[in-house]
């Protein structure tokens, strides 16, 4: 069994259990509901800061994924954003995969896809 594949399976299992980390009392104010993101609770009497039972969870180092596979695509490849054919040719097909930028048009996208097939580079959004 490949070590990288094993760590990717562990990461997937950890991600299923990980809660959504949202700011304190995000349900109370509409301005927080529309833009959910983490902000550390800093209030002097904050139950969430004190990690009281029944209060939302806070992010900590224990929730992180294994360091060797952190930031990788679920397929195990490192993502590289590609804007043109020249950038595609710099990719190592054994450990990197291309993601074509959203600003690339249809004609250039076809050129990139054709060249990727020749080079054997995996494209994540064909």
From Swiss-Prot:
<protein>
    <recommendedName>
        <fullName>Large ribosomal subunit protein eL32</fullName>
    </recommendedName>
</protein>
<dbReference type="Pfam" id="PF01655">
    <property type="entry name" value="Ribosomal_L32e"/>
</dbReference>
<keyword id="KW-0689">Ribosomal protein</keyword>
<dbReference type="GO" id="GO:0003735">
    <property type="term" value="F:structural constituent of ribosome"/>
</dbReference>
<dbReference type="InterPro" id="IPR001515">
    <property type="entry name" value="Ribosomal_eL32"/>
</dbReference>
<dbReference type="InterPro" id="IPR036351">
    <property type="entry name" value="Ribosomal_eL32_sf"/>
</dbReference>
<keyword id="KW-0687">Ribonucleoprotein</keyword>
<comment type="similarity">
    <text>Belongs to the eukaryotic ribosomal protein eL32 family.</text>
</comment>
<dbReference type="InterPro" id="IPR018263">
    <property type="entry name" value="Ribosomal_eL32_CS"/>
</dbReference>
<comment type="subunit">
    <text>Part of the 50S ribosomal subunit.</text>
</comment>
<dbReference type="GO" id="GO:0022625">
    <property type="term" value="C:cytosolic large ribosomal subunit"/>
</dbReference>
<dbReference type="GO" id="GO:0006412">
    <property type="term" value="P:translation"/>
</dbReference>
<dbReference type="InterPro" id="IPR023654">
    <property type="entry name" value="Ribosomal_eL32_arc"/>
</dbReference>
């Amino acid at each position: 069994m490949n070590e990288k594949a094993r760590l990717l399976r562990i990461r997937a299992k950890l991600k299923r259990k990980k809660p959504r980390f949202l700011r304190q009392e995000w349900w109370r104010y509409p301005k927080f509901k529309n833009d959910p993101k983490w902000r550390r609770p800093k209030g002097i009497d904050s139950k969430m800061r004190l990690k009281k039972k029944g209060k939302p969870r806070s992010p900590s180092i224990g929730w992180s994924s294994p360091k060797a596979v952190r930031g990788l695509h679920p397929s195990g490849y490192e993502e590289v954003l590609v804007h043109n054919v020249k950038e595609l040719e710099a990719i190592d097909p054994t450990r990197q995969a291309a993601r074509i930028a959203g600003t690339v048009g249809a004609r250039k996208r076809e050129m990139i896809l054709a060249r990727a097939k020749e080079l054997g580079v995996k494209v994540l959004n064909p």
